[in-house]
């Protein structure tokens, strides 16, 4: 049973694109539109990913930022995350207007993170590639990878854990440490088929 209807997913992707285009072109942050479905005012975690079109998945990323926790209404969080992904991802220069027609927008709506309990060595058995995203926290460090990432890279569960440690700026085997917290979550993912094209729900497997 999906939490997010297909038409809501399309609404969010279109909203993310409009937010990016308006900010990149005019420096203006849009407001949630009138007629926003009331369900999208519920607080949920969300990430917006920008991918370059017609580029292999491992090389396509152009920006990805979001909110792991449900701290903002989903419609507002989508606008914020879209703009941040376009201009504030520290891995990339800000998106230029000339790039807007070559970028595919993807919106991932997250479930609240769930702490994985039990001995650290059992963690790989308690996650599933193709279903779960991961958050790893240790001290001041934290890192998140969305559920679609291990699919795109062909990782198994242990490699997924190691790469999330790496994303957090930690050694790749830190998931074996007792004081490392590992959280899992799921996501409903919607993406444009091509820039400004039809929006579809993205299956993971």
Swiss-Prot record:
One Pfam family it belongs to: AMMECR1
Residues forming coiled coils: none
Protein's recorded name: Protein TON_1965
Domain AMMECR1: 7-201
């Amino acid at each position: 049973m999906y939490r997010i209807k297909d038409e809501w997913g399309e609404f969010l992707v279109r909203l993310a694109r409009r937010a990016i285009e308006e900010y990149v072109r005019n420096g203006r942050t849009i407001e949630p539109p009138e007629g926003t479905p009331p369900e999208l005012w519920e607080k949920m975690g969300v990430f917006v990913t920008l991918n370059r079109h017609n580029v292999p998945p491992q090389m396509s990323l152009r920006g990805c930022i979001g909110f792991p926790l449900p701290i903002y209404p989903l419609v507002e969080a989508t606008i914020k995350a879209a703009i941040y992904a376009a201009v504030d991802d520290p891995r990339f220069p800000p998106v230029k207007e000339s790039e807007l027609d070559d970028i595919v927008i993807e919106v991932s709506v997250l479930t609240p993170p769930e702490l994985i309990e039990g001995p650290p060595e059992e963690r790989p058995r308690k996650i599933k590639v193709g279903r779960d995203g991961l958050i790893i926290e240790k001290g001041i460090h934290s890192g998140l990878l969305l559920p679609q990432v291990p699919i795109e890279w062909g990782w198994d569960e242990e490699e997924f854990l190691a790469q999330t440690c790496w994303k957090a700026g930690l050694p790749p085997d830190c998931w074996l440490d007792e004081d490392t917290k590992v959280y899992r979550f799921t996501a409903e993912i919607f993406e444009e088929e091509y820039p400004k094209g039809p929006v579809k729900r993205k299956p993971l497997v």
